């Protein structure tokens, strides 16, 4: 184990091991009898002591001793000396067991339990820990127990931080000491303790960890701490609104279900059978408290008092990055309305980490309500024809600039300086896998903080090349680098209105839907969706995607092309269940049904048992098929599709096609063929 060769046992060692096993079986048999019969005599307790001296991992024996201690304490007078004597004996047994096996979970847990009784000297525990940590300075059990002991004392976190200094300077490879340092610093920084202001302390910590990284570059401990520091540098405590739809200054056209005959408007057109459209707020971190009291709406659109805001994707959750409310309109009442949204003017929006949203934002858009011209033709959506070039004057991309500039007003100066210093430092580091990865992360961090359009995006080519190098150097982590490469590429695409507009089109056959083409790019992950909330038609075909995670935020999405990817099951499409506007879905030529064992199926938010499946007519008529295709059933029943393509998958066939037509009754087109009766 851990690269150490296993040598054959000598005959005398095997004989000793066999004798120990016989003794252990005898002790275990006697012990279990005592435990079963609840015998807590001195002899029975001594027997458990002998058992634990041989096998400190006998967890049942530790539990037995807890019961025995409680029994003995209940039988004596409340004399502190007698209580201490009983508990001190337990500490002695634990210490003996730890000398046998320093990594015994049961022994450390039992010692915590004894100490929590409050009759033992905490000072003795710290002295004992120092002895143990000299034997094994990296043992995480001891460090975990140390944190527990320190909480029971008046020892300051600053003193403990100094202790980690000493342990790290003695051994840079002490991962547990680095971890404890991050725990202590997190607490001290959160308290704004004297001498622990982030803009001063974090740059100092970068200098501290450099000693470890450049002295022992092949050891991972310092690198992990550096990654933690980078996270602290990037994370702004106060949550920020990163995007919204509609965006500030935009105009949208609203109608009922159907078409706007001859519509050539460059405004975003939204057609809805329900007579409502989504308002989307996207925060940089999960927040709660988004409600009609914290987000106010001024509009002449009737029936929108007390709007209900829901978190996406989980309605049962109290926090999310994405919040959606639906604003009602009457398509039979054509008119133009100004809508003003104020976010955070009243307190109440709070991040999952407990920080208040204190960057109020106001945006105004115009809603043009039009009559609907019913279209009796249910034409098939083509992904090759009917597209027009993007109008550079469109205001749909306003939010890319507006909110970026607003958030740039936050105090990022010291953070930018820290990142710049690290980029300069690691830019001269000799080539190594971890060095290249760290430099790529630092350059991504620098891009995240840039607000000046003149310099924004200049590092992406270098970042992409670094991940290309890593994929070639380190095949065992290829998929991770591939995913990071995809995320960096999408950040590059969405970094400016100019770069994003190169991938945008209008689909004239459906009210000039906004179409984003990201096909044939070898993407394996979806990212930057906060910049794509206005997209209605998305082409992700001919990539290497395994799931649709992230697309749940794109509430306007009505057409999605995922053909020729690497999707292995319908559970990988689970996020689409929250995109209620989706009408056209192409998942042809994927790997659905190809793998007999697919663990991703269990990521799907499925019913707890088959008895909860198929309570509708389809489930009652075909319970066997619902059970067989339960993940497809769960996803498809939540969608309102009119066009679906599944050809080229292992699952495709007459049986599954028949099942789909029953599950999605409004489906008109299946694999390019029009459903009979339509």
Swiss-Prot record:
It holds the Pfam family PPTA. PFTA repeats lie at residues 40-74, 86-120, 121-155, 156-190, 201-235. LRR repeats lie at residues 510-532, 533-554, 555-578, 580-604, 638-663. It is an enzyme of class 2 (transferase). PROSITE patterns: LRR (PS51450), PFTA (PS51147). SUPFAM superfamilies: L domain-like, Protein prenylyltransferase. GO terms for cellular component: Rab-protein geranylgeranyltransferase complex. It catalyses: geranylgeranyl diphosphate + L-cysteinyl-[protein] = S-geranylgeranyl-L-cysteinyl-[protein] + diphosphate. It comes from the Eukaryota. InterPro entries: Leu-rich_rpt (IPR001611), LRR_dom_sf (IPR032675), Prenyl_trans_a (IPR002088). GO terms for molecular function: Rab geranylgeranyltransferase activity. Keywords: Leucine-rich repeat, Prenyltransferase, Repeat, Transferase. Belongs to the protein prenyltransferase subunit alpha family. Heterotrimer composed of the alpha subunit RGTA, the beta subunit RGTB and REP; within this trimer, RGTA and RGTB form the catalytic component, while REP mediates peptide substrate binding. This is Geranylgeranyl transferase type-2 subunit alpha 1. It comes from Arabidopsis thaliana (Mouse-ear cress).
């Amino acid at each position: 184990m851990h690269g150490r060769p296993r040598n054959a046992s000598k005959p005398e060692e095997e004989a000793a091991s066999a004798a120990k096993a016989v003794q252990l079986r005898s002790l275990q048999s006697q012990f279990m009898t005592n435990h079963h019969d609840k015998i807590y005599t001195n002899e029975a307790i001594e027997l458990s002591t002998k058992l634990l001296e041989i096998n400190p991992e006998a967890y049942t024996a530790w539990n037995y001793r807890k019961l025995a201690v409680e029994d003995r304490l209940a039988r004596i007078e409340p004399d502190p000396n007698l209580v201490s004597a009983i508990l001190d004996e337990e500490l002695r047994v634990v210490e003996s067991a730890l000398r046998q096996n320093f990594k015994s979970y049961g022994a450390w847990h039992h010692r915590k339990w004894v100490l929590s009784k409050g009759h033992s000297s905490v000072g003795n525990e710290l002295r004992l820990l120092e002895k143990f940590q000299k034997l094994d300075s990296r043992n995480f059990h001891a460090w975990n127990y140390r944190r527990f002991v320190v909480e029971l004392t008046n020892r300051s976190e600053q003193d403990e931080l100094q202790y980690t200094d000493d342990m790290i300077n003695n051994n840079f490879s002490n991962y547990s000491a680095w971890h404890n340092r991050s725990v202590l610093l997190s607490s001290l920084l959160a308290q704004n303790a004297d001498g622990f202001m982030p803009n001063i302390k974090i740059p100092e910590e970068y200098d501290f960890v450099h000693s470890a990284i450049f002295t022992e570059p092949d050891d991972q401990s310092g690198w992990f701490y550096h990654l933690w520091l980078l996270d602290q540098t990037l994370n702004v405590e106060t949550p920020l609104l990163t995007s919204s739809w509609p965006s500030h200054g935009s105009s949208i056209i609203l109608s009922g279900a159907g078409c706007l005959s001859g519509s050539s408007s460059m405004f975003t057109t939204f057609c809805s059978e329900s007579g409502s459209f989504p308002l989307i707020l996207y925060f940089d971190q999960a927040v709660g408290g988004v409600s009609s009291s914290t987000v106010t709406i001024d509009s002449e659109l009737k029936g929108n008092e007390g709007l209900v805001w829901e978190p996406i994707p989980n309605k049962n959750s109290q926090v999310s990055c994405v919040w959606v409310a639906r604003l009602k309109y009457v398509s039979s009442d054509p008119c133009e309305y100004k809508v003003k949204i104020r976010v955070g003017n009243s307190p109440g929006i709070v991040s999952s980490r407990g920080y208040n949203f204190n960057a109020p934002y106001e945006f105004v858009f115009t809603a043009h309500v039009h009559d609907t011209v019913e279209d009796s033709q249910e034409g098939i959506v083509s992904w090759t024809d009917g597209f027009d070039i993007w109008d550079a004057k469109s205001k749909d991309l306003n939010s890319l600039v507006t909110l970026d500039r607003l958030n740039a007003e936050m105090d990022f100066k010291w953070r930018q300086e820290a990142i710049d210093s690290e980029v300069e430092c690691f830019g001269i580091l000799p080539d190594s896998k971890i060095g290249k990865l760290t430099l790529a992360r630092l350059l991504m961090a620098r891009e995240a903080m840039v607000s000046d359009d003149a310099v924004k995006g200049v590092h992406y080519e270098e970042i992409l090349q670094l991940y290309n190098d890593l994929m070639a150097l380190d095949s065992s982590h290829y998929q991770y680098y591939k995913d990071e490469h995809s995320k960096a590429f999408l950040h590059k695409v969405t970094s400016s209105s100019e770069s994003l507009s190169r991938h945008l089109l209008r689909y004239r056959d459906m009210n000039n839907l906004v179409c984003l083409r990201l096909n044939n790019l070898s993407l394996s992950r979806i990212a930057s969706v906060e910049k794509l909330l206005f997209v209605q038609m998305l082409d992700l075909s001919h990539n290497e995607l395994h799931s649709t995670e992230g697309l749940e935020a794109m509430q306007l999405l009505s057409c999605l092309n995922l053909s020729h990817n690497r999707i292995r099951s319908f559970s990988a499409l689970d996020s689409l269940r929250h995109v209620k506007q989706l009408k056209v879905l192409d998942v042809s030529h994927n790997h659905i049904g190809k793998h007999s064992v697919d663990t991703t199926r269990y990521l799907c938010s499925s019913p707890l048992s088959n008895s909860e499946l198929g309570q509708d007519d389809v489930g009652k008529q075909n319970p066997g098929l619902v059970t067989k295709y339960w993940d497809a059933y769960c996803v498809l029943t939540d969608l309102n599709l009119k066009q679906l393509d599944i050809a080229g998958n292992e699952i495709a066939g007459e049986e599954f096609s028949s099942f789909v037509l029953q599950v999605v009754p409004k489906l008109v087109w299946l694999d390019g063929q029009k459903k009979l009766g339509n």
